[in-house]
Amino acid sequence: MDSLSFSLSIPLDEDGLLEMECDYCKGRFMLSKKTFDDDNNLDFFCPICGLPNKMDTFYCPEVLEIARQVATNYAMDEIYKQFSKTFKGFNKNGLVKMSMKKPKHVSVSELYTPINEYKMLHLDCCDINIKATSFDDSIGVYCPICGGTRL
């Protein structure tokens, strides 16, 4: 079976950071696109709860929903194309006529805008910037790369 790939643009804030969400604690934070795209970072530590997880588990639900909508629209278009070809051949003999209406696309949600309630934090251990809420900063955050704490 062939594999397909789609590309989505995840919105960045004015500082070039993208909003992420931990799969475990559901805490949100922001990480630079450069850090996120670095192939050396296969796993990240959640800056909020400190638990490690695979990089691709930190997408926000809004981004995952948009990806699902894009994939659904593509699948519906492909199914329609295949059935249309089948019906054309079926309708040639004139005894039975079949038709099919093109399915409506699932509306692709506009990409959300990250909340603007984050505070820029510099983590000296790995020399990176992240954003977390003031509350998370007050109780301490973890470095997403090495897991070290910033209290």
Report each predicted region and the residues it spans:
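N-terminal alpha-helical interaction blocks
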Residues: 1-11, 68-103
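Cysteine-rich micro-motifs
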Residues: 39-53, 137-149
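Acidic, proline/glycine-rich low-complexity IDRs
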Residues: 1, 121-124, 131, 138-151
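Short metal-binding segments enriched for Cys and/or His
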Residues: 48-67, 74-84, 148-151
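Short Cys/His-rich Zn2+-coordinating modules
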Residues: 1-11, 24-34, 99-110, 122-130
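Short, flexible, mixed-charge glycine/proline-rich loop motifs
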Residues: 8-19, 34-41, 107-120, 131-137
